[in-house]
Amino acid sequence: MNMKQEYHQEFLTGERALFQGKNLKIFDTIFDDGESPLKESRDIELYGCMFKWKYPLWYAENITAKNCTWFEMGRAGVWYTRHITVEDSAIEAPKNFRRCSDVTLKNVSFPNAAETLWHCDGVSMEHVTAKGDYFAMNSQNMKVSNLTLYGNYSFDGAKNVELRDCRLLSKDAFWNSENVTVYDSFISGEYLGWNAKNLTLIGCTVESLQGMCYIENLVMKNCKLLNRDCSATCEALQSEHKRARYGIIHARKNEGIARKACIWDGGADV
């Protein structure tokens, strides 16, 4: 078994500083001015490193980053990369994680998460905080727990997503999504879930003006719906009005508000 070459407290500049690096352990190193320092790298471990310029990890594979920092100009940092784990790190740069597969994020903050996690496949997130619009657009096969998100248009077009114990302050969340299940979470934002297919909310608190319209197959169980104007309505509702502690669901049949089946579980606050 080959021992990994180690770098300690380096200050690396210039384009492609460690291009096609393989079997490396890199400690407390600053990747300063210079694009694509680890492009096409393989089997890399990063500990306490800092990325200060663009495109650090493109077309890379088998990457582990712990206690690392992507500064604002480290934008578009991880694209077209497979099998990457980032833990206990801060990513200030926008447009990170694009068309990646097998992504694991644990205890990561994204203070500028605009256009982050686009078109990714196989994403696991635990204890992530993100602020920015269009988070996780068109990504699929995601398992997310304890995500706190401040940003609109999240999960647009996402497929096969499971969220647990999350807090989403997001207008237009889950638009055009498919096969999304949310457990024990708080969601606040207008127009939740429009044009989605197979959206399930279980044990959630939802505050959404005109939310959940034009949905095909909506399931809600043990949910609280707060401060709601006209929202999800469909043929499956059994009465014209179902009163809740926190609002009214208006069931107006044959108006095309929601498509096909909506299921309102008897235990829900609806």
Regions found by a protein language model. Give the residues of each.
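Long, distal/terminal scaffolding or interaction modules
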Residues: 1-270
